[in-house]
Every structure is written in structure tokens, then in C-alpha cells.
Regions:
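Short, small/acidic-rich helices and loops at N termini and domain boundaries
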Residues: 1-85, 268, 326, 350-359, ...
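Glycine-biased, small-residue-rich flexible motifs in mid-sequence functional cores and linkers
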Residues: 3, 72, 80-364
């Protein structure tokens, strides 16, 4: 019965996501919203006589019966804003949808979530970058989110499936259809290692106005949004702007300055709205993520052979400290900062130290 009230809350005329959350905060649950009297509802800020009447109208409850049957038949999970199953990263966003429909097996609470977006008219360059970038995470516990559209979205999902990486497609319509239709097989395959997610009930068409709203979910689910290839006037840049508004990291691959399909990425980088990256290692560095693949690629040479005594001394202190700033390191090594800077650069070049933001250093 709880599900019926949750669904009904999203069907009320005049009640959007913000007001729905406000109703839940005041009443305690979706069920209590509908058990409240008109007088009680009108005491809540933003609820006037008309909206209170809409909430208590019997047609609201009757309208969700068909949706409940669809959910049961297709084994769809309903993720409600006030419940622990709701994606934590998305819940932090002020305009997050109050309810989501999810079909699949992905863990939406995965610690490392990457959104990949880009143009529908991807070039071979964009496709190659996307596939290579995704493949770099095949040994990592990551979730890749995209929009199941033509072009970069599809390439990202396909590369994930090829490399056994969980991937979720966020839709701008109900789960009773797939748009574009050519991606039906891809969508079915994603249910085995990932899934499909939408805020829209069954029967919702892929109308144009739905996709900017869809983009906020793509941005909100992730720690970082990566723009692979995009024009200036594309949906990918909308997603990037939303991610920036959420104070999430945005990265972009640079492209040919004369190629229209790279103009959006270059613009994001030029205007400091995205970090320039050229590989998964660049992203891992930015996010301070450890990559399993990097550890396995370490050279099996002893430190005594590849490091001179001064380098070995600096390395040992960094390793013992876990991570350390250059000032503290200069104090512990009794070296000048200029001398230390040279040694640190040499250690970075040899792959035994990693530089972090804020002049911090750690071992791989």
C-alpha cells in the first residue's frame, strides 16, 4: 500500500518534486500526506486550497492502479526519496526527483560513479577515445552512467558491457519503451550488468522537454561527468553545466580546434568549466582514485636499483607518512625546497610517487 501513496504523490497536479518533498517533511510519509485533512494540508507553506483539493481528489489514487500493475509485472524497483535505497549522490542535489523507476541489478550506491556524455554524431576519434577510456576501468569497481542515446552514450554503454563494467542508462521516458528503438537490444543487455533508470512512469513519451530533466539525473548520480566529444549546443554541455552547479567535477577530452564536434569540449576547457583529461589515469589523479590496473603495471625492479640514496630517503619518508606536504617533507629530509622539488619530479617520472593537489605527495 505504501507504494500506491508514493506513486500517487507524483501524479498530483500542481505538486512538483520540491513541493512533494516539502509535503513529506511536514507529514512524515507519502501515506500521511493523503491521510491529512484539507485544513492540515493548507497549513503547509506552498499548499493552497486548489492544490490541497487536488491531493484529496479520488482520481489521484485511481490513476496509479495501472502503474502498480506495470511495476509488478516487469519487476521494477521504485526508489523513493525518503528511503535508504535512493541513490545517495543524487539525493544531495536540490532538484532530485522524489521518485525513480529502476530495472536492473546495478548498485546505485557504488562509491565510484562516472557519467559519460557526448554528441549523438560522434566521429571515429570520439568513438575511439570513449572505448579506450571505458576499457581502462575494466578491473575497477565503478559504475558508468549515460543516456542511452545515439553516439557517445551508446559507445560508452557498449564498451562497458564488453569490459564487464556495470552501466546504467537514464531515460527521458517510461520503462515501457526504448528510445531510440535501435538501442532495444543494447538496453536488454544492460539489464544483465547495470540497468535502466527513469523518473517517468510508463506511458510517458520521449518528448523533447524531458531530456534536459533527464540530464540532471545523469549529472547527479555521478562523482564526475566526462564529456568525450560534444558541440557547443549539445545536451552534453547542459549535463556538464548541471554537474558544475551541483559542485561535481567535470572533465573533457580536448579535440581538433577546427572540428565542430569538439567545439563543446574545447569551450568547457577554455572557460575552466572542465578539467582537461587525456586518459583514465588523468581522471584517477584528479579524483584521487587508486586504479588496480596501475598497481599491476608497476615495474618489478627493486627500489635500491632504480633510486639513488637521496631519492630513496625521500621515498621512504613519503611511504611511511601515507601522504605528506612539501613543507613537512622539507623539514623531515632537511633539504631545501628547490632541491626537494627536483627529487620529487624525478620520483614522479620514475612512477614511484604521485603528486596530489595542494603540493601533497603519496606512493602509488
Amino acid at each position: 500500500m505504501k507504494l500506491v501513496y508514493q506513486l500517487a504523490l507524483t501524479q498530483i497536479k500542481g505538486v512538483g518534486n520540491t513541493l512533494a518533498k516539502q509535503l513529506i517533511d511536514h507529514c512524515g510519509s507519502a501515506e500521511e500526506v493523503f491521510r491529512s485533512s484539507k485544513k492540515q494540508l493548507m497549513l503547509i507553506p506552498g499548499i493552497g486550497e486548489r492544490v490541497a483539493g487536488n491531493i484529496l481528489h479520488k482520481e489521484v489514487m485511481n490513476a496509479v492502479e495501472k502503474e502498480v500493475a506495470f511495476i509488478d509485472k516487469h519487476k521494477i524497483k521504485v526508489l523513493f526519496w525518503s528511503e535508504p535505497e535512493y541513490p545517495v549522490k543524487l539525493k544531495q542535489c536540490i532538484d532530485a526527483p522524489v521518485l525513480l523507476y529502476f530495472k536492473g541489478n546495478a548498485n546505485l550506491q557504488t562509491k565510484k560513479v562516472i557519467s559519460i556524455v557526448g554528441t549523438r554524431n560522434a566521429s571515429e576519434y570520439g568513438k575511439s577515445i570513449c572505448e579506450e577510456f571505458v576499457a581502462s576501468f575494466r578491473q575497477e569497481d565503478v559504475l558508468v552512467v549515460s543516456g542511452l542515446a545515439h553516439g557517445i552514450d551508446s559507445f560508452a554503454h557498449e564498451a562497458c558491457l564488453k569490459n564487464q563494467i556495470a552501466t546504467v542508462g537514464v531515460l527521458g521516458h517510461g520503462l515501457d519503451r526504448i528510445y531510440p528503438a535501435i538501442n532495444r537490444t543494447l538496453a536488454t543487455d544492460m539489464l544483465k550488468n547495470g540497468g535502466l533508470l527513469t523518473e517517468y512512469p510508463s506511458g510517458t513519451n520521449p518528448d523533447r522537454q524531458n531530456f534536459p530533466s533527464r540530464n540532471r539525473i545523469i549529472a547527479g548520480l555521478a562523482d564526475v561527468t566526462v564529456v568525450v566529444e560534444a558541440t557547443i549546443k549539445g545536451g552534453a554541455l547542459i549535463t556538464a553545466e548541471i554537474a558544475n552547479a551541483y559542485n561535481r567535477d567535470v572533465c573533457a577530452f580536448p579535440g581538433d580546434i577546427k572540428r565542430q564536434s569538439s567545439s563543446g569540449c574545447n569551450h568547457l576547457i577554455k572557460t575552466h568549466r572542465a578539467h582537461l583529461i587525456s586518459s583514465a589515469k588523468d581522471l584517477a589523479y584528479l579524483m584521487n582514485w587508486d586504479l588496480t590496473s596501475e598497481k599491476k603495471e608497476e615495474k618489478q625492479l627493486s627500489l635500491e636499483i632504480i633510486l639513488n640514496p637521496e631519492e630513496k630517503h625521500v621515498f621512504d619518508i613519503v611511504k611511511e607518512s601515507g601522504s605528506i606536504g612539501i613543507d613537512a617533507l622539507a623539514y623531515k629530509t632537511n633539504l631545501t625546497q628547490s632541491k626537494l622539488a627536483i627529487l620529487l619530479l624525478e620520483l614522479e617520472m620514475k612512477g614511484v610517487l604521485i603528486a596530489l593537489p595542494g603540493k601533497m605527495y603519496r606512493t602509488p
